[in-house]
Swiss-Prot record:
Residues 71-107, 109-146, 148-186 form the EGF-like domain. Residues 191-274 form the Kringle domain. The gene is HABP2. Cleaves the alpha-chain at multiple sites and the beta-chain between 'Lys-53' and 'Lys-54' but not the gamma-chain of fibrinogen and therefore does not initiate the formation of the fibrin clot and does not cause the fibrinolysis directly. It does not cleave (activate) prothrombin and plasminogen but converts the inactive single chain urinary plasminogen activator (pro-urokinase) to the active two chain form. Activates coagulation factor VII. May function as a tumor suppressor negatively regulating cell proliferation and cell migration. Pfam families: EGF, Kringle, Trypsin. This is Factor VII-activating protease. Its main location: secreted. It is an enzyme of class 3 (hydrolase). The keyword rRNA-binding does not apply. Residues 312-553 form the Peptidase S1 domain. GO terms for biological process: blood coagulation; proteolysis.
């Protein structure tokens, strides 16, 4: 029923195993008294019984604060970039770099274009042999762009454009159909940018002064901060093309251009901003509400100031209302001998009637399932709680488990209205926003939950912890998940200090990242190995936005 019941620990609460975990938490108890903090019963019953052993743990930690990290494998965090292999060499490491990369961490890109002129084209660096190629200007062809082909055969004009030859054999023009433009009629009527264009993924490759953009993998850009070989290039929409992008959050999309055949500079692009109508209703659909139940005034905003309270097993006891979209999935069934009725998975409220969770949390029939919102202490019924039955479960159709690893691990729960309404907005119950684009590796995000999974106990209080997003390249290294992470998954944790941040969430609970003061659900707690030692693995919500919205809209029509 659950993912990896044996050796796969789905983000368990226990962060540092055994007595040593207690040594870390007890020290903070003694040095930072907090009159508002109430310890968990679980904490007392499981960790406070053997005072002699606990005292010795504390002493060991005090004498050597780096005790936990002394024998860390230097390759654990895979410091080698660009798919390099990390080799342990005594107390340090060396990186074995694939072509065309070099450097002590494979951070440099070798310029394979130095002795390979492209004539009527631009030389590009590639990641496959011979690690360079020529991007020829039409109508030139060949490995060095020296051969000329007929300019209009085959027709280079796209989207039904008509090609006309000019006097010079290499010159031509495209007569574009209505609403299409560009040298090859490649730019459609919907090619525009929203806000500052950070999420722009169109095909404009001309600047406002009509200069042609350089390819992002041009050899001329190897020394630039932004190119195809930068970390998270794909998340920025940067690849082996020369389309305008805005990776640094400038005021609009831009690109690099070549000046005097040598010098590189940048210019803003000739791409229009989308009109207000396009932004509000990009597909021209009737602007009907999603359901008959009104949505909340806003999403992803809290009314609670962050308050740092006593650390509990590597996480923090969360302030009530700090994660108002947090949902507790509870069942009236006893799932296993060690798991009683009650809370068993987490979720996130994305609409008054909809909760997002993991597919592997939805093997229970709706009649045995309820969702509690605004919950802080699982042992109490609090005044700000709202409880709902589940009307329907929508599991993603391609969800599957292979070798105990859940793929496409996402599901939607449609809540059953109470007294004619679903969730009511309050300080303690709010919706989290769906993301409109990717977040970068290294972004600090939150996981939250009670730390309860199907194989162990957790805290009675809602916990949270900060984690950092980790690129799939690093997460797929041999030292971590060895190519088990697919494009619909993301990793998050703390590679420098493992053990303090990977186990506070519940299966199905939210990984939320913030932008401009608004929280977005970027991941769903899915699975992991060696809890506290490797990053947690999450379903990447941006990969399923179309399915989420289509499912909710379809149900709204009933």
């Amino acid at each position: 029923m659950f993912a990896r019941m044996s050796d796969l620990h789905v983000l368990l609460l226990m962060v540092l195993a055994g007595k040593t975990a207690f040594g870390l938490s007890l020290l903070s108890f003694l040095t930072e008294p907090d009159p508002d903090w109430t310890p968990d019963q679980y904490e007392y019953s499981q960790e406070y019984n053997n005072q002699e052993e606990n005292a010795s743990s504390t002493t060991a930690y005090s004498d050597n604060p780096d005790w936990y990290y002394e024998e860390d494998d230097p390759c654990l965090s895979n410091p080698c970039t660009h798919g390099g292999d990390c080799l342990v060499s005594g107390a340090t490491f060396t990186c074995r770099c694939p072509d065309p990369f070099s450097g002590n961490r494979c951070q440099n890109v070798q310029n394979k274009c130095k002795n390979n002129p492209c004539g009527r084209g631009d030389c590009l660096i590639t990641q496959s042999p011979p690690y360079h190629r020529c991007a020829c200007k039409h109508p030139y062809r060949g490995s060095d762009c020296s051969r000329v082909v007929p300019v209009c055969r085959p027709n280079p004009c796209q989207n039904g454009g008509t090609c006309s030859r000019q006097r010079r054999r290499s010159k031509f023009t495209c007569a574009c159909p209505d609403q299409f433009k560009g040298k090859l009629c490649e730019i459609g009527p919907d090619d525009c940018y929203v806000d500052d264009g950070y999420s722009y993924r169109g095909r404009v490759s001309k600047t406002i002064h009509q200069h042609t953009c350089l390819y992002w993998n041009s050899h001329l850009l190897l020394q630039e901060k932004y190119n195809m070989f930068m970390e998270d290039a794909e998340a920025h929409g940067i690849g082996e093309h020369n389309f305008c992008r805005n990776p640094d959050g400038d005021k609009k999309p831009w690109c690099f251009i070549k000046v005097n055949n040598v010098k590189v500079k940048w210019e803003y692009c000739d791409v229009p901003a989308c009109s207000a109508l396009d932004v509000a209703n990009p597909e021209g659909r009737p602007t009907e509400p999603l359901t008959k139940f009104p949505e909340f005034g806003s999403c992803g905003r809290t009314e609670i100031a962050e308050k740092k309270v006593k650390r509990i097993f590597g996480g923090f006891k969360s302030t009530a209302g700090k994660h108002p979209w947090q949902a507790s999935l509870q069942t009236s069934l006893r799932l296993t001998v060690s798991t009683p009725q009650g809370h068993y998975c987490g979720g996130a409220l994305i609409h008054p009637c909809w909760v997002l969770t993991a597919a592997h949390c939805t093997e229970i029939k709706t009649k045995y399932l309820k969702v509690v919102l605004g919950d802080q202490d699982l042992t109490k019924t609090e005044f700000h709680e709202q409880s709902f039955g589940v009307q329907k479960i929508f599991k993603y159709s391609h969800y599957i488990e292979i070798d105990d690893i859940p793929y496409n691990d996402i599901a939607l729960l449609k809540l059953k209205p109470v007294d004619g309404h679903c969730a009511l907005e309050s300080k303690y119950v709010k919706t989290v926003c769906l993301p409109d684009g990717p977040f970068l590796s290294g972004t600090e995000c939150y996981i939250s939950g009670w730390g309860v999974t199907e194989t162990g106990e957790g805290s009675r209080h809602l916990l949270d912890a900060k984690v950092k997003l980790i690129s799939n390249t690093i997460c797929n290294s041999r030292q971590l998940y060895d190519h088990s992470i697919d494009d619909n998954m993301i990793c998050a944790g703390n590679l420098q200090k493992p053990g303090q941040d990977s186990c506070q969430g519940d299966s199905g609970g939210p990984l939320t990242c913030e932008k401009d003061g608004t929280s977005y659900i970027y991941g769903i707690v899915s699975w992991g190995l060696e809890c506290g030692k490797r990053p947690g693995v999450y379903t990447q919500v941006t990969k399923f936005l179309t399915w989420i919205k289509a499912t909710m809209e379809k149900e709204a029509s009933f």
